[in-house]
């Protein structure tokens, strides 16, 4: 009997030690990412950054940032690299997680822009005019205040899209709040409202097409969609495949970890 108790006690100690060792993954900066299990959203800047900059990484790519966060909560991975505002939305809903910032990310912000098929000068010019008019006329500031309010209370504007005879298709990945996400049965967000204004200015009816982020550029190239509004960062690799509008927002990458 005593021998059984000793064995059980020893086993409990081993399991307790194992549990403690798992909980002691310390990540406080970029420097701590080497050799860790990192989750990212497939096709994003975060994925490319991890591939290029983190040594001995065990990289897992997910359809959405939330999918990566769920694996983080379940201890299948050690951290998630994601854009700041979507990361904040995830952490607000998951109090056991927190955000780590790093000066490397803060000092190298990325710019979001709308993408069109290479050579689609007419649509690109129309989009650029809308962005310029929004900034000059105050509509852009109103949109920022609606979806990124200081008090955190988002106000979704009424649908602004025109009912034209011609349809323009916006491709997005509706898992990137506050830029694009699902609210009830509708896809809403900063980019979606901006897309509505773009369509209205062009006298066209907007159709929003939701798909995986890494499917957006192939869909644009094939003509399945007409433009991408999905918190897409401008970089040299993407410039080879699409034409970008004037930029409309700056963001940075952050690290999500368990508390």
Residue spans for each PLM region:
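Extracytoplasmic small-molecule ligand-binding "clamshell" domains
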Residues: 58-61, 165-232, 240
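Immediate post-signal peptide segment of exported/extracytoplasmic ligand-binding proteins
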Residues: 22-37, 152-187, 221
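Periplasmic-binding protein-like
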Residues: 84, 88-128, 150, 156-157, ...
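Ligand-binding clefts/hinges and TM-proximal coupling segments of bilobed small-molecule sensing domains
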Residues: 48-54, 99-104, 128-165
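Short helix-initiation/N-cap motifs at beta->coil->alpha
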Residues: 23-28, 42-45, 60-74, 85, ...
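Acidic, polar ligand-binding/catalytic clefts
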Residues: 23-32, 94-107, 200, 205-259
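Alpha-to-beta junction loops
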Residues: 36-39, 55, 73-82, 86, ...
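C-terminal motif of bacterial Sec signal peptides marking the signal peptidase cleavage site
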Residues: 15-19
């Amino acid at each position: 009997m005593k021998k059984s108790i000793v064995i059980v006690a020893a086993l409990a100690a081993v399991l307790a030690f194992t549990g403690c060792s798992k909980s002691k993954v310390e990540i406080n900066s970029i420097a701590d990412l080497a050799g860790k299990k990192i989750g990212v959203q497939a096709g994003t800047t975060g994925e490319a950054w991890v591939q290029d900059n983190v040594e001995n990484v065990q990289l897992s790519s997910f359809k959405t940032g939330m999918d990566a966060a769920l694996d983080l909560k379940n201890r299948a991975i050690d951290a998630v690299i994601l854009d700041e505002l979507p990361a904040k939305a995830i952490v607000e809903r998951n109090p056991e997680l927190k955000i780590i910032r790093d000066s490397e990310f803060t000092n190298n912000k990325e710019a979001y822009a709308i993408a069109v098929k290479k050579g689609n000068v007419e649509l690109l010019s129309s989009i650029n005019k809308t962005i310029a008019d929004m900034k000059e006329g105050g509509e852009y500031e109103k949109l920022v205040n609606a979806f990124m309010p200081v008090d955190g209370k988002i106000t979704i504007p009424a649908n602004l899209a025109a009912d034209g005879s011609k349809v323009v298709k916006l491709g997005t990945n509706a898992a990137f709040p506050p830029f694009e996400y699902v609210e009830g049965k509708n896809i809403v967000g900063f980019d979606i409202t901006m897309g509505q204004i773009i369509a209205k200015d062009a006298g066209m009816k907007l159709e929003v097409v939701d798909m995986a982020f890494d499917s957006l550029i192939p869909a644009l190239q094939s003509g399945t969609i007409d433009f991408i509004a999905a918190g897409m960062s401008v970089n040299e690799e993407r410039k080879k495949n699409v034409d970008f509008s004037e930029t409309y927002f700056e963001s940075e990458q952050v690290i999500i970890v368990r508390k």
